[in-house]
Design a protein with these regions (language model features):
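Active-site acidic/histidine proton-transfer and metal-coordination neighborhood
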Residues: 3-7, 18, 98-200, 276
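Non-transmembrane, interaction-prone segments in cytosolic or luminal domains
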Residues: 69-70, 74-76, 81, 134, ...
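Acidic-and-aromatic substrate-binding clefts and catalytic sites of carbohydrate-active enzymes
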Residues: 34-41, 62-73, 95-101, 111-117, ...
């Protein structure tokens, strides 16, 4: 793991070596296979082994809202991952909660999942117990300028606490982070109103592309702020997530300029994947076309 505040990933430092990898190891956001991991009676260890068998080295999760990680305490889940040859890098959790719509069946009366505003200490404690190096916000309320400002405040606290526990904090984008709200975007506001050594972005390459953004232009605008990537593709016709290399995202252009971003970990993600063959084909395409 890098020292806190360092902007040069280990794989870049070692690039002169004949055995150094050109890019970070291929990882997977296991939300891609949530239909397996969240199924009743799921064999978590067996599923993690299947993930390792397709060539994945690192994983990111999207769970823990109730303190369990696919039914396991963080230490147990981390041990399962390690036993199958996987390294657990971090977990997605919500940021500033959205205000639920008022109705007779409003979800407001239900227990709220843990989030960074209300449960940051427990979330960081879980990440530390699991040996994670990152705490990641999956999404946050950003529909108004006030929400954007409050989201940034939550992220400042998350970045501080993560650093105090030898971890780092990142925010994962969707398309809405690039919407103009009272003359600003949540994406720009967060990056210009937080400490660049404590608050980073996990850039979802597909959703940034769908929002009309060039990821490389973002790297140039905010160099070193993108140590985490979601490597996701979008179907050229439907705009829905599809296996990497079969859609419209220009991965060769992006990876060629990866050093600008400060990338350390890349995670394949495919919302709506039908089976493990989908991420397996993404791994193979990356190995044949990017990691060759």
């Amino acid at each position: 793991m890098l020292a806190i505040g360092s902007s040069i990933p280990n794989w870049i430092v070692a690039r002169d070596s004949s055995i150094a990898p050109k890019y970070p190891p291929v990882g997977l956001q296991v939300y891609t296979l949530g239909f397996l991991l969240n199924a009743p009676g799921a064999d978590t260890r067996s599923i993690l082994k299947q993930i390792a068998d397709i060539g994945i080295k690192e994983i990111e999760t999207a769970t823990g809202g109730n303190g369990l990680y696919y039914g396991q305490k963080p230490k147990v889940f981390a041990e399962m991952a390690k036993d199958t040859g996987l390294k657990w890098i971090g977990n997605h959790i919500g940021g500033l909660p959205r205000t639920p719509a008022a109705s007779a069946t409003s979800t407001a009366a239900r227990p709220r999942s843990r989030n960074l505003r209300d449960n940051i200490q427990e979330i960081v404690d879980d990440a530390a117990e699991g040996g994670c190096s990152w705490v990641i916000c999956s999404s946050s309320a950003i529909s108004t300028l006030d929400e954007i400002k409050r989201t940034a405040e939550v992220f400042v606290k998350a970045g501080d606490l993560a650093e105090q526990n030898n971890m780092r904090f990142a925010y994962h984008n969707h398309q809405s982070e690039f919407d103009q709200i009272e003359g600003v975007t949540a994406f720009d506001y967060v990056l210009t109103n937080t400490d660049k050594k404590k608050v980073f972005m996990e850039l979802d390459l597909a959703w940034a592309t769908a929002a009309g953004q060039d990821p490389v232009a973002l790297f140039k605008k905010y160099p070193g702020r993108f140590p985490l990537w979601h490597v996701k593709d979008l179907d050229k016709t439907t705009g829905r997530p599809c296996p990497v290399g079969t859609g419209k995202v220009d991965f060769k252009h992006i990876f060629t300029n990866s050093k600008l971003s400060g990338v350390e970990h890349t995670f394949i993600e495919q919302d709506g994947a039908k089976n493990i063959d989908d991420p397996a084909s993404s791994v193979q395409w990356l190995k044949n076309n990017i990691y060759k």
